[in-house]
Amino acid sequence: MAKILVLYYSMYGHIETMAHAVAEGAKKVDGAEVIIKRVPETMPPEIFAKAGGKTQNAPVATPQELADYDAIIFGTPTRFGNMSGQMRTFLDQTGGLWASGALYGKLGSVFSSTGTGGGQEQTITSTWTTLAHHGMVIVPIGYAAQELFDVSQVRGGTPYGATTIAGGDGSRQPSQEELSIARYQGEYVAGLAVKLNG
């Protein structure tokens, strides 16, 4: 049995929705145990509420538990072309895992969201840098998801990983095409994890 963690941060719910789609895809794979968790919120509760943050039900992960999984699929919104501060703070606490090589050889993949499209690919590839320092095997999705070829509408999605475009005010929710790409990413990573660890 391969253990897959979908680990995310979501302020307004876009990445949370994508995380559930990623997990749904991963659960299609026989031999995959899939768990969804989120990183801790670093914003004071009153500021989070004032900013319109969405309360989420996923359990909160600890950095140390990352070593328990065969694959980790990270989801983060874009903040100026980088991962969110909450995800960065969480990953900055993995120094002990790095020192012991606890994540070496584990699969790592990334999905993201952005307001208007700018920075979505940069967010994924800049997150890969942290995964590389841990010795993780980075898993992009390539162009196997057919939705990536659809240019008839505005949508997220890259060969690096699934993405969604939230709109400048956050009112746009992930489209069916974006969720389909996210499901593909989950299924693809879980399939590889089962092959390697099953």
UniProtKB/Swiss-Prot annotation:
Signal peptide: none annotated. GO terms for molecular function: flavin adenine dinucleotide binding; FMN binding; NAD binding; NADH:ubiquinone reductase (non-electrogenic) activity; NADP binding; NADPH dehydrogenase (quinone) activity. The keyword Coiled coil does not apply. The keyword Signal does not apply. Its cofactor is FMN. It is an enzyme of class 1 (oxidoreductase). It holds the Pfam family FMN_red. SUPFAM superfamilies: Flavoproteins. One of its GO terms (cellular component) is membrane. This is NAD(P)H dehydrogenase (quinone). It comes from Salmonella arizonae (strain ATCC BAA-731 / CDC346-86 / RSK2980). The lineage of its organism: Bacteria, Pseudomonadati, Pseudomonadota, Gammaproteobacteria, Enterobacterales.
